[in-house]
């Protein structure tokens, strides 16, 4: 019989400060210098001006994507690396590590990341965005596809949406420079939540993704979604699936979460002894694992009857998750 893993509190503050410091140092020391090659020659004055704008874009988007609210952290956004567990991607029997975006980029230029609700797709996309800044010489752009739900079909354009994302965050380019950088393959474009696009917009968004990625094929495209049969027709995209949390990862996640220590310690112990093995489909999903922790803290146990667990937790907490869907 496997011995329970001993609960050991994590210094979340040190994790945050170390990770943030490394990211900021990487961005500050490289920045414009490493992506300038994707743009036409500027005058010295233009290069300084646009370089400053690019560094502002990296600073603003890095800060925005490094913190989120969750079911646990509902009021104050938390640094994702204070609790995030890097999950693997399954591809034809192989496991692709995601701790460094460079390993993901080896898959190809067009990648689908699929997984069930709560598995952590959106937070993975944020992690890949941040890893792009730190580890590569590409310009990352993260776009939530649900933003198209408020548009008329005729106004939906990936080309304009990517440009708007750059511009809204301080990196405004003349169209000729923007188009040139796309043609040169200067971007990693992360399109999050294809499954969240309304049905009446879905065909148009699909057409936009296909035409844009075909026209500017030198860039890398990573699209997240729940599984859908629509992807069967995306012949030049490689579909990967997000792997569930291992027992070790589930325990690590619980250990990192800021929560009532006595309740967390008791849950950690039970998760190690029996709960993960008994309820693997729940405990290996970050969102459901969080719900298990909340339910356990309220009742000092997990109901034997899973229907009771659903009734107690799912309706309320999944509605809450819709409001904070970037995370778990």
What is each of the regions a protein language model found here?
Residues 3-326:
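P-loop NTPase signaling cores
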